[in-house]
Amino acid sequence: MASTVPSTMKAWQFSSAYPTIEANLKLNNNAPLPDGAKNLGPDQVLVKVIAAGLNPVDFKFAEIPWLGRFIVGSPSTPGMDFAGRVVATGPNTKSVAVEDLKPGQLVFGRLDSPCKFGTLAEYTIAPRKGCVAIPPGARVIETACVASVGLTAYQSIVYRLKDHAGKRVFLNGGSGGCGTFGIQIAKQMGCHVTTSCSTPNVDLCRSLGADTVIDYKKTDVIAELKKMQPFDLVVDNVGVPTDLYWAAPSFTNPGAPYVQVGALAVTPGFILGNFFKARWPGWLGGGKRPWEFMHIESNVQDYEQLGRWMQEGKLRAVVDEVFGMQDDGAVKAYQKLRTGRAKGKIIVKIDETWED
């Protein structure tokens, strides 16, 4: 491995997250390799990154006042999702059920959490449980954006309903990363899907399989939901309207889970509000529907299912735009992501010579 891995790499890095990470992102042409790159630990995979998919969590944790620097380290490279090629693997402890990954194999996946050595770099170290082979026929660049949102959508729907066929699911926010995958996954499971989006994205959501689309620019979302048959599951990808959860008893069946995926910002008020939703008794003013903030766990079998659906043409990544590594590509990519107006996913191509 020593002969194939350079001593330095190109990586986008930031040393301050104030006021935003993109305001401080710089391309370092001589960044150090991730710690342990030449001496991999158990169940680690060194990946040469071809493309990285962006997610709001990339900057939301880093930008938490005071704590962000300690969570991700400094200087830091953002990014959790990737598609790339295996360079080397560490000892396999069999702690997770994975196939043997071979050097040269094309893979996609995600890191466990935002960290100092993210995926907006030429090399990253992924856990084996978060790294699986790209199925034949899949577009490599598109798989770079699948892991986080695909897994979130899959686990928020498949894990939360015992019987899926005919169940009514409301996805709040259908045109972003989690929403576009969520619509397709819920339909694969046989659910009836209602979602919300703005006027320009109505046709997109319908094309992905949504049965009913609420245009929040033209009507009140909660008022429309109250007119419909009760739902069995709510997945909130955006966090607005802010009173959506508190109104849930008026448009959901008793016991229907409410899964919080997205939020405008991680603030003290947001954290306190979530405590009341999750822990405070309903008779004392707390939540009257089971509420949880979505936490995903990398699972090889789930990634492989997503890959099979993509291979079979049953699941597609909706890509808003692909940026390059050079010319402030990462800066522009995060600026667009932060607007909240992207249709689907935003990708940064790390290896600009790669063509699917």
From Swiss-Prot:
Coiled coil (UniProt feature): none
Record's keyword terms, sorted: NADP, Nucleotide-binding, Oxidoreductase
Gene3D superfamilies xrefs: Medium-chain alcohol dehydrogenases, catalytic domain, NAD(P)-binding Rossmann-like Domain
Expression induction: Expression is significantly up-regulated at the end of late growth phase, in the presence of Butyrolactone I. Expression is positively regulated by the pgm cluster-specific transcription factor pgmR.
Pfam families: ADH_N, ADH_zinc_N_2
Alphabetical list of InterPro entries matching this protein: ADH-like_N, GroES-like_sf, NAD(P)-bd_dom_sf, PKS_ER, YIM1/Zinc_Alcohol_DH_Fams
Enzyme class: oxidoreductase
Enzyme Commission number(s) from the entry: 1.-.-.-
Phenotype reported upon loss of the gene: Does not affect the production of the naphthoquinones derived pigments.
A Gene Ontology cellular-component term: mitochondrion
Record-level Gene Ontology MF annotations: nucleotide binding; oxidoreductase activity
Disulfide pairings: none
Source superkingdom: Eukaryota
Residues reported to bind NADP(+): 57-60, 175-178, 198-201, 216, 261-262, 342-343
Reported function: FAD-linked oxidoreductase; part of the gene cluster that mediates the biosynthesis of pleosporalin A, ascomycone A, as well as a third cryptic naphthoquinone derived pigment, all responsible for the coloration of conidia. The pathway begins with the biosynthesis of the cyclized heptaketide 3-acetonyl-1,6,8-trihydroxy-2-naphthaldehyde by the NR-PKS pgmA.
Family matches, as PANTHER family: ALCOHOL DEHYDROGENASE RELATED, RETICULON-4-INTERACTING PROTEIN 1, MITOCHONDRIAL
Family of this protein: Belongs to the zinc-containing alcohol dehydrogenase family.
Protein name: Trans-enoyl reductase pgmF
Organism: Aspergillus terreus (strain NIH 2624 / FGSC A1156)
Organism phylogeny: Eukaryota, Fungi, Dikarya, Ascomycota, Pezizomycotina
